[in-house]
């Protein structure tokens, strides 16, 4: 709950604006990491949720990885100081330039949406003399009957 002093101060600020409760964010991140650690899970923050550098810094300091779905998100995570190996790059329509940047940065993994994308990443990685770790999304065409 916000104090009267805070709400009075907020009344003086032009809108719209964002107000982040960094203490709550830190507590939530600690809780997520503590629970994930009990099972050996790795937690990645969806950068698309909010790529404000102050948020990304807190997320990085808490030990989470970065889940990115665009080249700009990969760049934001790298510039925020995430360990490149903790950056995962998913999403469709990755450009050659975005793939090159991700490879040069040394990201942990590409999530590939198709065999064609896998071939493009392989070609670019080969040309750059890099190794690309990938996860390939497979659609087994099974009706889950849901």
What are these regions (language model features)?
Residues 1-126, 130-132:
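A charged N-terminal "starter" segment
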Residues 134-139:
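ATP-grasp fold ATP-binding core
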Residues 140-146:
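Active-site loop/helix belt of alpha/beta enzymes
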């Amino acid at each position: 709950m916000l104090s009267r002093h805070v709400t009075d101060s907020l009344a003086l600020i032009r809108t719209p604006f964002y107000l982040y409760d960094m203490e709550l964010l830190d507590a939530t991140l600690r809780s997520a990491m503590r629970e994930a650690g009990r099972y050996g899970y790795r937690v990645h923050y969806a950068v698309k949720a909010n790529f404000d550098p102050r948020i990304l810094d807190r997320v990085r300091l808490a030990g989470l990885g970065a889940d990115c779905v665009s080249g700009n998100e990969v760049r934001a995570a790298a510039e925020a100081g995430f360990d490149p190996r903790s950056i995962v790059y998913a999403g469709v329509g990755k450009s050659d330039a975005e793939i090159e940047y991700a490879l040069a940065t040394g990201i942990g993994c590409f999530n590939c949406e198709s065999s064609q994308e896998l071939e493009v990443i392989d070609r670019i990685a080969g040309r750059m003399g890099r190794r690309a770790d990938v996860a390939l999304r497979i659609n087994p065409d099974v009706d889950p009957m849901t």
